[in-house]
């Protein structure tokens, strides 16, 4: 509690001093009127005081005939008022019991005000802490942005205590990353019962997956830049460091190739795909110094059909600024990166688009993105997908909010939660720091799950990491061994004030002892104490609140936990089928056992009946 001692105002004491001055002067004059008493029987003159009390009304209250003695007596009254004014010389500010810090653990009752009255409309943090997902259902003072940073190492129950309980809530659309590829099977039934559309993008096996064709979401030159930025930023894995020369060259060439396919697709009425970028890269080099390469001829043809187009301008800019060995190096980088599209299965999942990203925040949708745990070769594709997700959904939300959407109104806009498990494996998402600052107003939130703060810093740099963390309304700590992370959370916990008692004793001829009480400051949680919380415990740091220490959420206590699957052999295991081509779907519907394999000879022997 803050206690502030302020300097007293002079004017009231000045008026008091004048009043006492006159009162003392007037009483002295009344004293002079009192008859003398016997000095033997009334040594202290109390008889005169008794007479004065009995004759207060005999003397006029107005007496301005001052004598030297009455002035002196009056000044003594004024001096009393002056001493009263000076009696407080300490004008400091005090916080009794909080001299070294006011940190303490939050209580369950204190966090109750952040909950929604409807349990299904809450986000689940720990066993006893939840927060309403929709700010319009909470009072203004209890509204916190819904971005969350989750710290948790391997085996710290990130999926079981954080991801699964919130999926079971079924209160929004979801985008969830999964490095094992089983979360959709374990939670799918609960989502189907809630009426969700299911989408799956598998970068682990490239099988049984929906398709993602980024060209479906390119509508103008700015979109070309966004796609090129997403790919080149992911290739530059430490994008906050190093020579900017190479990223600049990469971006120019990337804009040129993607732009060519975009404009050529519009002119010839087809939907391009990233695999065709690989085909163009193979034709970049000249076979003879004097003979133009196939790609050069393609750009010349595009310029004839669409003069001054953006792709041709970027191509000219690239050729004018980079030549010789530099150009060859850029070609080599692109050839290496895009060689992943030589895999037939990968080309299949980027040929057509069935994800329908623009519908995710207006139709209840659950999206599962399977990303490899250790292989970074496809990070540029997952980063590109997330770049498209944020761009498309922000545009959809803006259209709905501004009343420009053809079929939906503001009441139809759904909240969308992105649960990004193993956030560092996604790759660098372009412009994430500003994106995370603005998605709140679009009913979008991101939950970033990392093992340490350094995982974010590697991708985005220290300053951008600060921006990302500052835009998180909550930090949920499940466990970590990273010292920087532990120090940060210890500092965030704050310092508390403790009573300290020192006792000393000396022995000998002049034995003595003393006891001294004092107050000291101490971290509420030291880095060691943060690191050694119980395996079933969690720490929750809500914005502007004290840290809350609680048990991790027990998944079995969720009302809909019975819908979860424990393995392929139980009835809750969700199975799905996606077809990457019409032939695959036809084969699956017909059944391999019903397919008759015949050769050309057998076909020639089939009699043809002509009517």
Regions inferred by a protein language model and the residue ranges of each:
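Short alpha-helical interface patches
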Residues: 53-60, 68-122, 221-231, 276-287, ...
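A short glycine-/small-residue-rich loop at the edge of a beta-strand within enzyme catalytic domains
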Residues: 112, 118-120, 380, 423, ...
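Short loop or secondary-structure boundary microenvironments that flank
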Residues: 371, 375, 422, 450, ...
């Amino acid at each position: 509690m803050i206690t502030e001692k302020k300097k007293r105002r002079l004017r009231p004491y000045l008026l008091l001093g004048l009043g006492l001055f006159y009162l003392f002067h007037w009483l002295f004059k009344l004293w002079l009127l009192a008859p003398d008493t016997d000095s033997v029987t009334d040594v202290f003159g109390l008889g005169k005081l008794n007479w004065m009390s009995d004759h207060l009304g005999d003397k006029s209250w107005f007496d301005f005939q001052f004598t030297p003695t009455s002035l002196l007596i009056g000044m003594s009254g004024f001096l009393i008022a002056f001493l009263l004014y000076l009696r407080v010389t300490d004008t400091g500010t005090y916080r009794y019991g909080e001299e070294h810090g006011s940190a303490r653990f939050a209580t369950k009752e204190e966090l109750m005000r952040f909950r929604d009255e409807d349990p299904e409309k809450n986000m689940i943090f720990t066993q006893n802490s939840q927060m309403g997902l929709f700010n319009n259902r909470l009072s203004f003072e209890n509204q916190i942005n819904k971005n969350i940073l989750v710290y948790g190492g391997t085996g710290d129950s990130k999926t079981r205590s954080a991801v699964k309980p919130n999926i079971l809530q079924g209160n929004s659309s979801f985008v969830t990353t999964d490095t094992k590829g089983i979360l959709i099977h374990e939670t799918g039934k609960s989502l189907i019962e809630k009426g969700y559309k299911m989408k799956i993008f598998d970068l682990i096996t490239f099988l049984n997956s929906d398709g993602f064709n980024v060209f479906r979401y390119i509508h103008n030159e700015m979109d070309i830049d966004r796609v090129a930025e997403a790919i080149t930023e992911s290739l530059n894995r430490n994008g906050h460091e190093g020579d900017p020369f190479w990223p600049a060259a990469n971006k120019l060439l990337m804009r040129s190739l993607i732009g060519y396919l975009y404009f050529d697709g519009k002119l010839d009425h087809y939907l391009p795909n990233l695999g065709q970028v690989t085909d163009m890269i193979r034709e970049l080099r000249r076979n003879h110094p004097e003979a133009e390469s196939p790609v050069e001829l393609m750009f010349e043809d595009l310029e004839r059909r669409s003069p001054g187009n953006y792709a041709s301008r970027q191509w000219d800019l690239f050729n004018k600024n980079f030549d010789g060995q530099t150009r060859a190096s850029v070609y080599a980088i692109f050839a290496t990166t895009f060689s992943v599209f030589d895999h037939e299965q990968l080309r299949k999942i980027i040929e057509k688009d069935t994800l329908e990203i623009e519908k995710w925040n207006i139709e209840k949708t659950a999206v599962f993105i399977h990303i490899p745990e250790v292989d970074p070769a496809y990070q540029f594709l997952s980063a590109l997908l997330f770049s498209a997700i944020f761009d498309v959904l922000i545009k959809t939300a803006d259209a709905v909010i501004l009343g420009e959407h053809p079929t939906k109104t503001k009441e139809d806009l759904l909240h969308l939660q992105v649960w990004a498990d193993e956030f560092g494996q996604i790759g660098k998402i372009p412009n994430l720091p500003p994106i995370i600052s603005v998605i709140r107003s679009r009913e979008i939130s991101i939950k970033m799950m990392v093992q340490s703060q350094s995982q974010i810093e590697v991708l985005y740099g220290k300053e951008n990491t600060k921006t990302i963390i500052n835009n998180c309304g909550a930090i949920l700590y499940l466990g970590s061994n990273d010292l920087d992370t532990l120090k940060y959370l210890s500092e965030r916990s704050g310092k508390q004030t403790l009573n300290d008692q020192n006792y000393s004793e000396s022995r000998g001829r002049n034995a003595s002892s003393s006891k001294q009480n004092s107050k000291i400051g101490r971290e509420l949680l030291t880095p060691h104490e943060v690191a050694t919380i119980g395996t079933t415990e969690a720490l929750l740091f809500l914005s502007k609140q004290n840290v809350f220490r609680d048990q991790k959420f027990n998944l079995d206590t969720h009302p809909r936990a019975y819908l979860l699957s424990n393995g392929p052999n139980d009835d809750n295991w969700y199975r799905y089928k996606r077809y990457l081509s019409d032939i695959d779907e036809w084969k699956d519907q017909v059944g391999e056992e019903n397919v008759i394999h015949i050769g050309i000879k057998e076909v020639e022997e089939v009699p043809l009946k002509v009517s």
